[in-house]
């Protein structure tokens, strides 16, 4: 990569980080102004268009980055699990770390999931689907269950995890710890239920084939 290309990438990165830094519990992406984001990134507002077509393209890039960041962290969690950690507890701890370290990235995913922009809703849905698919792959490999079962289990788990994440954004450390314990219990219940449901289905098949 040449010097000019490196500088362009650095400025683009600064714009993304500037936009993330301006999000908060009170401030959504829709309320950000191009001028403020450009000023925070240290460039003239007119230079913004050298990097993004418009503010929406910046937002979609942020959604993609948030989803990718979360998936990469969960992959690292699965590597930790492979070394002997508890699957559910390690995954929950990693997820809560993500929210603690990147609250605005998670806020963006939550808000735009049901926001007014169809493009943003589709982008968030795509990221969540990637997340579900990766978890289903892992469950299929570990539990030796058919894809239909692991996908249903993964979708239930991700739905509960995102709901808990929304609560975790605005509570203190002690409440977050309690929330984490509740989430571990809920996910274990889903995992047990999926296992017994699958076993029951297998028994039915075996019974009918006799």
From Swiss-Prot:
An example Gene Ontology CC term for this record: cytoplasm
Its transmembrane ranges are none
Subunit arrangement? Answer: Homodimer.
Is Protein biosynthesis tagged as a keyword? Answer: no
Q: Name one GO biological process term.
A: fatty acid biosynthetic process
Question: What is the role of this chain?
Answer: Represses the transcription of fabB, involved in unsaturated fatty acid (UFA) biosynthesis. By controlling UFA production, FabR directly influences the physical properties of the membrane bilayer.
- The Swiss-Prot or TrEMBL record marks DNA binding at 33-52
Q: Which SUPFAM superfamilies match?
A: Homeodomain-like
Q: What is this protein called?
A: HTH-type transcriptional repressor FabR
Please give the InterPro entries that the UniProt record associates with this protein.
Answer: DesT_TetR_C, Homeodomain-like_sf, HTH_TetR, HTH_transcr_repressor_FabR, Tscrpt_reg_HTH_FabR
Q: Give the keywords, sorted.
A: Cytoplasm, DNA-binding, Fatty acid biosynthesis, Fatty acid metabolism, Lipid biosynthesis, Lipid metabolism, Repressor, Transcription, Transcription regulation
Give the GO molecular function terms. DNA binding; DNA-binding transcription factor activity
Underlying gene = fabR
Keyword ATP-binding on entry: no
All residue ranges annotated as the HTH tetR-type domain in the record: 10-70
Main localization (coarse)? cytoplasm
Where does this one sit in the cell?
Answer: Cytoplasm
